């Protein structure tokens, strides 16, 4: 999340970054400074310590020095220097990274009138545009804590030096800091990388490659259930399903603009067919445009809705890869709608309703909507400025008509059109884009897509790109953390653990398993040699949504005692009614992982 530069929290975190750098230079005056910005939840500063980097053992001493600087109430004052003056000042302490950046700011015209901003507090001076607190004493007692050390390439370039990044947490007061630390502790327990391994959902193998997850049987069930749901929803909404190849000749991507606009996120080309270049596809869009173009279209065909769970491949730097959240191979809940100009609003509203229905059903509540706009000053966007403004206004008005609160973010649009992004927050408030919907006014022209209008004229369709359930990888990573691995019955890899209290009822337990299997309900019998309590504990640890306990009374009356995950009530039900209840929970996709949802009997 971007922080408002005029906000008090921005000033606090930015000032603490400077105080951190000042404290570090007290113990390591030879350190070279990189960047030190405020960020979500705190701040960081990058340093080059040469051959002797600091460790996390040094953080305690650095923090003590920061507190001393805070207690001195050093005033922050702003000044400006020419490039020549800045170079001379920075050269005194061999701040080569700062000198490089100073030259860049002047050469690119980003330094107003060629003047570079500097801030001074006490004996410390740093090139900076601010803003800051009035003085260091305005930092509230106990509101910050140095957090960790990580590596970071200078300017994010793997070919440049590796710097040491010191992270700090900072909030308006001590209570807010402690609250964040507690929420982070809970989030670490729910981390999808941790639970993904514990629950056998996915694996990453070095020989397979970084960012290329192996979906294990349990994870594949999660994928299959989400995909089945999406296919039902899309069928009812009039979508037609297609399947398209994952590699494509380079000509297609030059036509679409992915080459060159998206080239940095694509894998290198493959040479074949007498040196023709093929690429792994980063997106499904060009293939769907070719499906549309495969035969003449009329206004009677529109809206023409194409859907595919398509496999995509995008090059992400190794350092940015993270579990399922950031990967190099992904499968997207993708669709493209080709429609007339006067159908755009209705289609967009239908998509918004689809998103709302998904999110409401899954009980997502903590999210915000962003209208992502182009940046007229950037060359990474294609198309006419007037058309950009018209398309952006269309999406803006649609969101207003839907009575959706939204933020506008300049420069975050797709290269071919504005988009609506859904930013979902996790336990610690970190935001990730989970879903997106884009209005495209460029690709119909690039691909020469047409339809015959009512008056017999050839016209260009508008294209809407949408992916409400994101990629399997990103969406499931979020579901794991949101539910803490405790999925609803319809989605859960093992829907029922059948636990006989002893060998004398094992046959009845296996009979139940066979009955459930015949109904396509996933179940397992735990009749291992472990004690009954241990077997119950195993089912809880694996977060199985339902345990059916089988004792002598249950076997005699052909019933089960039903224990749900994290629910105290344990009713005893006739077997046939229990199976009917499970079938209802599955068919209605009930969110029974929430305690307020009762067994439908």
Task: Walk through the language-model features, giving the residues of each.
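A glycine-rich phosphate-binding loop feature that marks nucleotide/adenosyl-phosphate handling sites
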Residues: 37-43, 81-90, 201-207, 244-255, ...
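Extended, charged alpha-beta segments that form solvent-exposed binding/catalytic grooves
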Residues: 312-398
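Metal-assisted phosphate- and nucleotidyl-transfer catalytic regions
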Residues: 72-120, 266, 362-437
């Amino acid at each position: 999340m971007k922080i408002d530069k005029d906000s008090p929290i921005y000033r606090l975190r930015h000032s603490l970054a400077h105080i951190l750098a000042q404290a570090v230079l007290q113990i390591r005056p030879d350190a070279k400074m990189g960047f030190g910005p405020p960020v979500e939840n705190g701040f960081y500063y990058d340093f080059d310590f040469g051959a002797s980097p600091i460790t996390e053992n040094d953080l305690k001493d650095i923090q003590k020095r920061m507190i001393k600087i805070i207690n001195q109430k050093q005033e922050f004052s702003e000044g400006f220097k020419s490039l020549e003056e800045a170079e001379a000042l920075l050269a005194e302490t061999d701040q080569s990274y700062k000198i490089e950046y100073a030259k860049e700011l002047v050469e690119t015209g980003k330094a107003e009138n060629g003047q570079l901003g500097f801030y001074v507090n006490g004996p410390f001076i740093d090139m900076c545009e601010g803003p800051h607190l009035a003085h260091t004493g305005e930092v509230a007692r106990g509101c910050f804590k140095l957090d960790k050390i990580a590596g970071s390439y200078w300017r994010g370039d793997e070919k440049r030096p590796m710097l040491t990044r010191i992270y700090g947490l900072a909030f308006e007061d001590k209570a807010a800091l402690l609250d964040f630390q507690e929420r982070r502790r809970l989030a670490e327990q729910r981390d999808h990388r941790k639970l993904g391994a514990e629950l056998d959902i996915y694996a990453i193998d070095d020989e397979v490659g970084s960012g290329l997850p192996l979906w294990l049987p349990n994870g594949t069930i999660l994928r299959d259930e989400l995909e089945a749901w999406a296919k039902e929803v899309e069928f009812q909404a009039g979508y037609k399903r297609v399947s398209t190849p994952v590699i494509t000749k380079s000509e297609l991507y030059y036509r679409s603009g992915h080459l060159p606009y998206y080239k940095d996120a694509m894998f290198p080309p493959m040479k074949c067919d007498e040196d023709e270049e093929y690429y792994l596809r980063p997106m499904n869009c060009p293939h769907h445009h070719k499906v549309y173009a495969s035969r003449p279209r009329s206004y009677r065909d529109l809206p023409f809705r194409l859907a595919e769970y398509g496999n995509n491949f995008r090059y992400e730097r190794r350092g940015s890869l993270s579990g399922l959240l950031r990967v190099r191979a992904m499968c997207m809940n993708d669709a493209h709608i080709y429609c007339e100009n006067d159908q755009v609003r209705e289609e967009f509203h239908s998509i918004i309703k689809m998103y709302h229905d998904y999110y409401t059903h899954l009980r997502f509540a903590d999210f915000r909507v962003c209208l992502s706009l182009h940046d007229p000053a950037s060359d990474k966007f294609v198309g006419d400025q007037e058309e950009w403004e018209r398309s952006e206004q269309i999406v803006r008005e649609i969101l207003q008509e839907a009575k959706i609160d939204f933020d506008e973010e300049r420069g975050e649009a797709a290269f071919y059109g504005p988009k609506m992004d859904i930013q979902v927050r996790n336990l610690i408030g970190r935001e990730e884009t989970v879903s997106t919907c884009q209005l495209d006014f460029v690709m119909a022209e690039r691909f020469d897509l047409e339809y015959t209008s009512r008056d017999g004229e050839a016209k260009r369709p508008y294209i809407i790109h949408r992916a409400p359930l994101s990629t399997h990888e990103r969406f499931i990573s979020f579901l794991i953390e949101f539910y803490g691995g405790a999925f609803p019955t319809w989605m859960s890899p093992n829907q029922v653990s059948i636990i006989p209290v002893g060998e004398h009822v094992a046959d009845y337990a296996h009979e139940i398993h066979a009955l459930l299997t015949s109904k396509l309900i996933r179940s397992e019998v735990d009749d291992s040699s472990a004690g009954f309590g241990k077997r119950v504990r195993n089912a809880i640890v694996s977060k199985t949504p339902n345990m059916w306990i089988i004792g002598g009374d249950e076997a005699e009356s052909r019933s089960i005692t039903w224990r749900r995950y994290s629910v105290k009530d344990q009713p005893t039900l006739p077997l046939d009614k229990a199976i009917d209840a499970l079938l209802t929970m599955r068919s209605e996709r009930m969110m029974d992982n929430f305690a307020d949802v009762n067994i439908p009997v």
